[in-house]
């Protein structure tokens, strides 16, 4: 029977499937951070249990860390308690930890792939909603809740219902200047923020195959923003080239065996999907969100939508509510929307390719008066490489702040947050009300679009001179 990529990975990880119950699947990698792990570790202690597979558990500090200082003194009391608790738990249970002083510390969904922890055909979980990022390697990766974190710690397994399958095909190649962020925002704009609910999505097509691993991670990262359980891209030579030599990737004969298996890991030609969505790559322009969810998105050469043009009363009410919050007028050209904050970072867009793209816009220019812009590399390794290439100097000379790795302004959980009324061009993944700070307004864009907005003081079409 023909199978999809998802079905192949799923079937190979079933431990038990009792009739009438959710199957029990095996977990190959468990990624842990300071926010969703304390209660899980506590649960193990109360029950007197050990960690089932410490060698398959990897921890980092990212959500509540400071991007201004690596000192514990720079943290709030709550944040300090969280990172110190994680350190103690990792020591007690024998978990490998990349703490704030480790050169490989970073956002969990950045450092995992770059260390080779993420491998094709594996099942990866983390107490974080953007775990789907790792699906870019042909892994089945999804976020779990704290009680599930404890279950995986104790058993290295998880009960899960099998999802439906959706194929999202982006035909042809995108035009120059169009990035992975534009592709995935265009997809979400087409199917909506709940269009993928109940599905595991496989992204494919010429435009997807042409992406680097960094670009593929951006696409899969935002699968959750279309409601999907996970996003996956079949591994190919680009995947293999990226993984070769990484710290936790197989070595020697094991590498050759792995590569042979990975090359065969793809959906069968006659595999049936429950849903199929097609986009033409040539139709995709630079994208940016205007509202309060990632599905409220338009192209840069379009206007703020008018709710009066919407016939569906529910959608109309949603548009009206969003416009009221973001304080935009229907019919306004998106290029006329001014910003006063810029955030380049997050698990969506903080990798070396993203920083190069932003630096290309910033080079030889200056951040506009009244705009504060920060650049937060996704990991210590990304920061090191960017500095070796001189990207930090380009940003600093242009007036951007160059920070330490961390989740930063993606969410209002640490000290990097917006004030009420701030309008931010952000390379993150969510533009919900208050996501970056109470009363703040977020517009999701690519790194190049964010950097260009910082220079111009408003959104611009990077395909044209500005």
UniProtKB/Swiss-Prot annotation:
Its EC number is 4.2.1.33. [4Fe-4S] cluster binds at residues 347, 407, 410. Keywords: 4Fe-4S, Amino-acid biosynthesis, Branched-chain amino acid biosynthesis, Iron, Iron-sulfur, Leucine biosynthesis, Lyase, Metal-binding. It catalyses: (2R,3S)-3-isopropylmalate = (2S)-2-isopropylmalate. Pathway: Amino-acid biosynthesis; L-leucine biosynthesis; L-leucine from 3-methyl-2-oxobutanoate: step 2/4. InterPro entries: 3-IsopropMal_deHydase_lsu, Acnase/IPM_dHydase_lsu_aba_1/3, Acoase/IPM_deHydtase_lsu_aba, Aconitase_4Fe-4S_BS, Aconitase_4Fe-4S_dom, IPM_dehydratase_rel_enz, IPMI_cat. GO terms for biological process: L-leucine biosynthetic process. The keyword Amino-acid biosynthesis applies. Its cofactor is [4Fe-4S] cluster. One of its GO terms (molecular function) is 4 iron, 4 sulfur cluster binding. It comes from the Bacteria. Binds 1 [4Fe-4S] cluster per subunit. SUPFAM superfamilies: Aconitase iron-sulfur domain. Heterodimer of LeuC and LeuD. Belongs to the aconitase/IPM isomerase family. LeuC type 1 subfamily. Catalyzes the isomerization between 2-isopropylmalate and 3-isopropylmalate, via the formation of 2-isopropylmaleate. This is 3-isopropylmalate dehydratase large subunit. It comes from Shewanella loihica (strain ATCC BAA-1088 / PV-4). The gene is leuC.
